[in-house]
Amino acid sequence: STDSTQAEETTETADTSAAEETAQVSSDEPCEIYMFISSPEYADAIGELIDAYKEVAPNVTINYETTQNDYPTLLKAKLNSGEVPDIFSSTSGKEIDVYKEYSYDLAGQPLTETMSDAVAATMQSPADGSGCYGIAIKGNYFGIVYNKAIFEECGITEFPSTVSAMKDACEKISAAGYKPFTTGFNEWWVYKHVAQHFFDAAAANAGISAAELVSGFENGTAKISDYPELYNNFFDFIDLAVKYGDDKPLETALDGEESAFGTGKAAMVLGQGAWIEADVLSIDPDIQIGFNGYPVTEDASQCQVISGSDQSLHVNKDSAVLQQTLDFMNWWYTSDYGKAWFTDVAGVVPPIKSDVQSNFEIIKQGDELAASAGAADLEIIYSTDSWHQTFGEIMQSYIAGDLDKDGACAQIEKQWQEIDGAQ
């Protein structure tokens, strides 16, 4: 089986890699590392990674547990009871500071030599720009995933990169009998992925950074209505997606999106990125996938993909098996197997400096677009997931008709200040 072949290859490279030798030396005593993280979509790939590490450090047992629902709540319960996992996860950016008191500073570790600059920037403390308080399972690309064949059939020759071009495209796609969008509006995190493109444009057009804009909302000085990119364009885009999207938008979750897109019913997928490609290809291996940014204004140059890492894996600074945990993390980022794992096993955007070409269209096109048109800021990392979840719930109330636009804006401003302003 592939597993055993990979394990054999790992055993061979173990003899030649200095990082792996170090791991073996310091792991002679049997020990257990407790790894409790989110991102269950990578459970199989991480299982393979752990199996491969067992070949290198046979005395180390990694007890791996993962969950998506309520992860922040479950983690906080563990931290409060003094059961800090040896490896735990959070979002990057603002939550680096939230969990900093529990996190080992990885600056100076071998893994920082291979970590990509974009990822390293999201692992620093935003408060003072210091340190490296985590590693990423993946870099990422966020944008609109679309079906090139449907676009072609509808006579849309280039991606609609302005607000008005997108409205025209939706009319054409709808007239041809397809759903222009599948939205996933049942998932709270879809809204943060869509909205960040509009927040980036709002910040850029106001001559400030996305981080400065977020801090304005946190301290109550910013208003949605001050920014047409948010008050007009973001809400108009949500309205457009509801009009031209799933029959029951608030009941459509990630699997519904993948199904609607993979079976050729919907032309564009909202709120997703590189992580859906494998599932979509398992539905239709021949689908022609396209990828681009969100049309946020009438300036086509502001339609950019977003790149970076929105998740961080922390090492417990007071771990009883600190050295063994560091050995594992360094091996993951520096060994031949570990470096190849990102593309070959997990199928993700590597968070490390890598010349390896991905087989995934979203990653290939993301690389090309980021190089040619630049990538916008990963705005979501400046807020906590506690806030993002509330934001998603407010937008769901807006779509359900329980809040009008001004009511939604008032809630966004009030809750943002209450949840993240206090942190």
Where do the language-model regions lie?
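Extracytoplasmic/periplasmic substrate-recognition and gating elements
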Residues: 55-56, 61, 81, 130, ...
